[in-house]
């Protein structure tokens, strides 16, 4: 029953009382709420960063022409049998992939958590959240190396975050009249 613009809220149905379509809509609504929460964003950034870092690490390890990490005792890897060479290469590739995945996941998780916390505290969604989160993340990750490294980390992460945010927000600009006017 509606009175003007105000609509009286309906009673909440249990899942047993809902149709399959209503159950699907309710499940999708709960999933969106979870993904938009700070813990959800933080976990998703960590997992996404882990997989992206894994692919990046695998690619970089496959392009590496130097001696594998754990083979300092081997004077010349070419002197080993082919099977042993392959074993060392794949072992090294796995270590590099996991290391890169772990680092990307950690950085993504920390940055996303800090940005979400800042956005919640400020109650605004603007570029300053990303800049501040970049500075805090970069400084926090480099603090063990000293205050100068923390300052450089802060500036570097803030600049990178600003560049990415500006690029992602550039879609709101009007498109060029033709391909030559940019």
From Swiss-Prot:
GO MF, one example: mitochondrion targeting sequence binding
A GO cellular-component term linked to this record: TIM22 mitochondrial import inner membrane insertion complex
Record carries keyword Membrane: yes
Mitochondrion among keywords: yes
Keywords for this protein: Disulfide bond, Membrane, Mitochondrion, Mitochondrion inner membrane, Protein transport, Translocation, Transmembrane, Transmembrane helix, Transport
Location in or out of the cell: Mitochondrion inner membrane
Membrane topology term: Multi-pass membrane protein
Stored InterPro entries: TIM22 (IPR039175)
Disulfide bonding pattern of the chain: 38-116, 135-154
TM stretches of this protein: 43-63, 127-143, 148-168
Purpose of the protein: Essential core component of the TIM22 complex, a complex that mediates the import and insertion of multi-pass transmembrane proteins into the mitochondrial inner membrane. In the TIM22 complex, it constitutes the voltage-activated and signal-gated channel. Forms a twin-pore translocase that uses the membrane potential as external driving force in 2 voltage-dependent steps.
Family statement: Belongs to the Tim17/Tim22/Tim23 family.
Protein name as annotated: Mitochondrial import inner membrane translocase subunit TIM22
Organism: Debaryomyces hansenii (strain ATCC 36239 / CBS 767 / BCRC 21394 / JCM 1990 / NBRC 0083 / IGC 2968) (Yeast)
């Amino acid at each position: 029953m509606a009175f003007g613009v105000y609509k009286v809220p309906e009673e909440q149905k249990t899942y047993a009382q809902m149709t399959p379509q209503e159950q699907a809509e309710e499940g999708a609504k709960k999933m969106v709420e979870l993904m938009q929460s700070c813990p959800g964003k933080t976990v998703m950034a960590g997992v996404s960063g882990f997989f992206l870092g894994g692919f990046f690490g695998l690619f970089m390890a496959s392009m590496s022409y130097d001696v594998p990490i754990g083979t300092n005792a081997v004077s010349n890897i070419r002197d080993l049998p082919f099977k042993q060479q392959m074993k060392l290469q794949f072992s090294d590739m796995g270590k590099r992939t996991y290391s890169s995945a772990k680092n990307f996941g950690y950085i993504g998780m920390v940055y996303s958590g800090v940005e979400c916390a800042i956005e919640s505290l400020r109650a605004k969604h603007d570029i300053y959240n990303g800049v501040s989160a970049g500075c805090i993340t970069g400084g926090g990750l480099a603090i063990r190396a000293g205050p100068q490294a923390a300052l450089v980390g802060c500036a570097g992460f803030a600049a990178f975050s600003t560049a990415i945010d500006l690029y992602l927000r550039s879609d709101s600009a009007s498109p060029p009249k033709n391909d030559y006017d940019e």
